[in-house]
Amino acid sequence: MSQSVLPTQAGYDRWSQIYDADENPLIELETQVMRQFIGDVAGRTVLDVGCGTGRHTSAVAAAGARVTAIDFSRGMLDRARAKPECRDVTFLTHDLSQTLPFPDGTFDVIVCGLVIDHISTLKGLFGEMQRVGKPGARAAISVMHPAMELLGVQARFTDPATGAKIACGTAQNATSDYVTAICHSGWYMAEMIERAVDDATIAACPRAIKYAGWPMLMAWRLLKKS
């Protein structure tokens, strides 16, 4: 079956209808790593950059954080706002190609899950996330592993109305692009993790078997100097 490619915003607006119910091995891998990297957030100010349907937003809000969440997809934001854990979250519509709309040193923790593989201006975004972090802030960042591009994989879903495969536009960043942007933005890279599809992933998401052994996730734990 052929695949259509939509601009990122339009693609995620459409995907929002089924995103949380869509069986996704990348999310299976990513959730475990990001929970570890995000850490204890009780009483902390948290910014969720590109929050989508609020997967991480709802988790950190339920853990006692004061959360601000931003995304440029109104469809995704509507889904996030509807989650009961997110009733006290501040949601903003914002395009990440623009300067973040917050003063310097606003947040204790910054979360950015499966977003920046759609961003070509990496140095600018990493720099902005560093700017709005307080001294000593930490960040948890994840992307689809660039190795997936060798298999022709990108963020995509099956439209429930038509059965068509729809992909959301990506920036095709290399590992070196991410690492260079981190190093030039003032963050300290405390940890970098790569995760491949393993037996546990396949058990939770059987369709992942065709990617067995392939790196699917890359994630970073970053720190800002105190």
Regions found by a protein language model. Name each.
Residues M1-A42, R55, A59, M76-R79, R138-A164, G169, ...:
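Conserved class I S-adenosyl-L-methionine
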Residues L47-Q98:
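Class I SAM-dependent methyltransferase SAM/SAH-binding core
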Residues L100-V109:
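A short acidic, Gly/Pro-enriched loop at the edge of an enzyme's catalytic core
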Residues V109-T121:
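A short SAM/SAH-binding and catalytic strip from SAM-dependent methyltransferases
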Residues K123-R138:
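A short glycine-rich, Lys/Arg-flanked "PGG" loop and its adjoining helix->strand segment in the class I
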Residues T170-I193:
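Short alpha-helix
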Residues Y188-S226:
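Conserved Class I S-adenosyl-L-methionine
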